[in-house]
UniProtKB/Swiss-Prot annotation:
It is found in: Cell membrane. Pfam families: Oxidored_q6 (PF01058). InterPro entries: NADH_UbQ_OxRdtase-like_20kDa, NADH_UQ_OxRdtase_20Kd_su. It comes from Deinococcus deserti (strain DSM 17065 / CIP 109153 / LMG 22923 / VCD115). This is NADH-quinone oxidoreductase subunit B. [4Fe-4S] cluster binds at residues 45-46, 111, 140. It catalyses: a quinone + NADH + 5 H(+)(in) = a quinol + NAD(+) + 4 H(+)(out).
Length: 178
């Protein structure tokens, strides 16, 4: 088929024959969203729930987050699970700075999102004051399904889609973004 004939045809007709039209940004965003490689920063009891999100029952690998990366240089998502002490904050910032761009952060649990239920002088009250957070997962500790939902919402954010079918941001009870 000549190139001129291809451009003269209707878009719907070409799509029905299996020819897809997109731009490079959308294709790269689709690839990034379906191959998020998380680096774990498990600090407390939320880390146990984070580990259970990869077991056979929950299987986070279905969504492209197959293996937790041991090195931040191989990861593009940091999952901060649990409380962050003020002594550990510079270490977490260093790990975040070692991640290649583009990078995203999920704050998992009440401690990572708001400092926890108890006001403690040694705990950072919001991880967002150390690194920029993209998705918050509330709960103490949140269930593995909540983390998987947050990963799915992060995939939508990476692709540049709306968060839900109604056009609203994420509900606060499940996960939310800033």
């Amino acid at each position: 088929m000549a190139l001129k004939e291809l451009f003269d045809r209707d878009w719907q007709e070409l799509e029905s024959e299996g020819i897809l039209f997109s731009n490079l940004e959308k294709l790269v965003a689709w690839g990034r969203s379906n191959s998020l490689w998380p680096a774990t920063f498990g600090l407390a009891c939320c880390a146990i729930e984070m580990m259970s999100s990869t077991n056979a029952r929950n299987d986070m690998a279905r969504f492209g987050s197959e293996v937790f990366r041991a090195s931040p240089r191989q990861a593009d998502v940091m999952i901060v699970a649990g409380r962050l002490s003020k002594k550990m904050a510079p270490v977490m910032r260093r790990v975040y700075d070692q991640m290649p761009d583009p990078k995203w952060v999920i704050a998992m649990g009440a401690c990572a999102s708001s400092g926890g239920m108890f006001n403690n002088y040694a705990i950072v009250q919001n991880v967002d004051s150390v690194v920029p957070v993209d998705i918050y997962v509330p709960g103490c500790p949140p269930r593995p399904e909540a983390l998987i939902y947050a990963v799915m919402q992060l995939q939508k954010k990476v692709r540049g889609e709306a968060f839900d079918q109604l056009g609203h941001q994420l509900p606060m009870v499940d996960a939310w973004t800033r």
